[in-house]
Amino acid sequence: MSEKKNKKEKLADEIEQEELNILDETEETVEEEAAADTLTEEQAKILELENKLDEVENRYLRMQADFENVKKRHIADRDASQKYRSQSLAQDLLPALDSFEKALATTSDQEEVKQILKGMEMVYNQILVAFEKEGIEVIPAVGEQFDPNFHQAVMQDSDENAGSNEITAELQKGYKLKDRVIRPSMVKVNQ
């Protein structure tokens, strides 16, 4: 009987040992799952932080690009302002220049008038030299092909000696500042 009892005890010990092993394995599995959940939460947090970092980096790069564009635009505006600084002064002086040209077109036999005209011509030439220094030029007209960017056609002509669309007369001089037209030439164009 003692042998049976020993076998029963042994069997009970084995069962108990097996139950303990199963319990240990279950605890390990639960711990692993909990650790996996914790790891997954940590990974999710890391992923979220990485996404936020990427978003902030992208915003930073966009802001940096915007700043560079504003800086370039400011430089271009400043350069254009410097380049065309004398435009308003030239526009204000053009009527006076036109008056000089009309006065110089008159002729007289009187010596006093000739001296006055000579003085006016000197002033006129000085204004033209000052214009040239600032990059202001007369727009060529007579004999040139009509260009609506530089010329304003106010009359048509029928001259057989001139080509089609050729300017035959200039009624008012046009001027440009570097590459910008200040005032187009008023012209007569051949048909």
UniProtKB/Swiss-Prot annotation:
GO terms for cellular component: cytoplasm. Its main location: cytoplasm. GO terms for biological process: protein folding. The keyword Cytoplasm applies. Transmembrane segments: none annotated. It is found in: Cytoplasm. GO terms for molecular function: adenyl-nucleotide exchange factor activity; protein homodimerization activity; protein-folding chaperone binding; unfolded protein binding. Keywords: Chaperone, Cytoplasm, Stress response. InterPro entries: GrpE, GrpE_coiled_coil, GrpE_head. The keyword NADP does not apply. Participates actively in the response to hyperosmotic and heat shock by preventing the aggregation of stress-denatured proteins, in association with DnaK and GrpE. It is the nucleotide exchange factor for DnaK and may function as a thermosensor. Unfolded proteins bind initially to DnaJ; upon interaction with the DnaJ-bound protein, DnaK hydrolyzes its bound ATP, resulting in the formation of a stable complex. GrpE releases ADP from DnaK; ATP binding to DnaK triggers the release of the substrate protein, thus completing the reaction cycle. HAMAP family: GrpE (MF_01151). This is Protein GrpE. It comes from Listeria monocytogenes serotype 4a (strain HCC23).
